[in-house]
Structure formats: structure tokens, C-alpha cells
Amino acid sequence: MALELNIEADRYHEVVALSASTAKHLLRSPAHYLMSKAEQTDPSLPMRFGTLVHALVLEPHTVSSKFAVEPGLPSRKTKAGREMAAEFEAAHPGKMVFDLETFQRAQRTADAVMSNKLARDYFTGPGVVTEATAYWTETVNNSLVPHKARLDCWNERLGMVVDLKTAQDSSPEGFAAAVRTYKYALQAAHYPRALEMVAGIKDVRFLFVAVEGEPPHGVGVYELDAETVEVARQQMRRAADLFVRAHHPSASAADLGYAQEIVQLKIGA
């Protein structure tokens, strides 16, 4: 096995397997995980913006084929603006459409990343592959569990996986809060495991490059502490157990939701 390249994001997301993203839903409950699979929602504006920034930094050669920039159109708040926007989108099927102002802001965000000496070294140069995909299986409770991961950047030269995040606040305090809120630590546990399983590479470092989508587009580079990553590994193992439960043919709705018992909550000050 090895990392696979040139796999489109849509094809990757269609594969049913345990990933850092699906683990977030599973850790809430298997029922929430199954609902997330059944009800695919359109990406939010921040998610779309993040996708564009990723392409500008990691795959600039794909931008023209995947994105389109609207010419100056009337406001979408007007009927004429909505109609003209709909016509433009229909003329660019399969592309993510942005207004010029948003596209330029994304370009400035990407430029800020590449102006950071550390980030530029991580994302460019020999031994760098971007948007690489890994598939593998592991045995959990006597069941084979499919796993998958999509790495923003694997820098073989430096022996590290680097994940690019757009953030509201990329200061140490602000990004630490985002790590807690969005469970980013699961990636720090899951992605190095992917390289170990598909390529036999151990002791891989995992870093985040966080960039603010608004001026002045601050950039921070972060590595999680060992204790946080170990907790995330335990959570991924628990998510694998829950994945097996979610896909068990005899599982009922009552088995997959929250515990049907009184749970004591301890609330800190």
C-alpha cells in the first residue's frame, strides 16, 4: 500500500470508512454519524472559502478548473442580481463560484501563508506531496474496520504531515480554542497512523499552519503536545468501536443514541 494521488475530493468522501471527520460524529453518537452520512449538506461559506485557500496554496494548478470568479454583478439581494448570478453558475457547471472580492481575499490569505518562512518550507520543495489519500483496514473487536485519511501535505524531506487551517483567530490562544471546539487533535492522531499503516513510516510529526481569513491574515504554526495527541489516539480507538456498532446489522436506534440512563455532569467553575 502507498499514498494515492490524484483522487478527487468527492470520490474520497464517497468511501465509507473511519476518518478524523467521521470520528467527530461517532464520538457524539453513532446515530449522529449515520445522520451525517444520510443528510449531505452544502458547504458553508467559511468552508467554501477554506477550500479555495487550500487550492491556492496546495494545488494552484487546479484553481482555474475548479473555481470561477463572477464578474461585477448587481447585489444578490436584488432579483436581477440573483438571476444573473444563477446564469453565471449555470455557465460554469462543476465549479465553485466566488465573487471577485472574496476571491481576492482568499488570494491574500494564501499569499500570507506563503510569506511565512516556516509554512513556505513545509509546503514547497522536493519530497512534498499534497492532497494525498490513504486507505487501510484495521481489526477492531474481531471486525475489519476500513480507515481513510486525506493529507493536506506530506513533506517526506522533513518527515512531517502539515495541515492547513483557515481560522478566525490563529493566535496561540485562539487556535487552541479551535482545536478544542473542532476536535482537530483527532487529525494529529489519525494522519501519522495513516502513514504508518500504508507506508510503514513511523515517528511522523504533525503540524498545523493556521491562517486568518481576514486582514492582517496572521499565520501561526502549531504542534500539539504529546498528552493531547495520546488522548486523541484513545478517542480514535473509541470511534473505531463505535463505527463497528453503527454498522452492525442488528443495531437499533436505541443502541446508537445517547445513553438511556441518568448521567451525572460535573461542571467546572
Language model feature labels by segment:
Residues 30-35, 166-171, 213-218:
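Short acidic (Asp/Glu) and glycine-rich catalytic loops that position anionic groups and cofactors
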Residues 1-148, 257-258, 262:
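Metal-dependent nuclease catalytic cores that hydrolyze phosphodiester bonds in DNA/RNA
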Residues 119-124, 155-161, 196-204:
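Secondary-structure boundary elements
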Residues 178-185, 190-269:
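Metal-dependent nuclease catalytic regions and adjoining charged, substrate-binding loops involved
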Residues 57-62, 166-169, 196-200, 244:
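Hydrophobic/aromatic-lined pockets within catalytic cores
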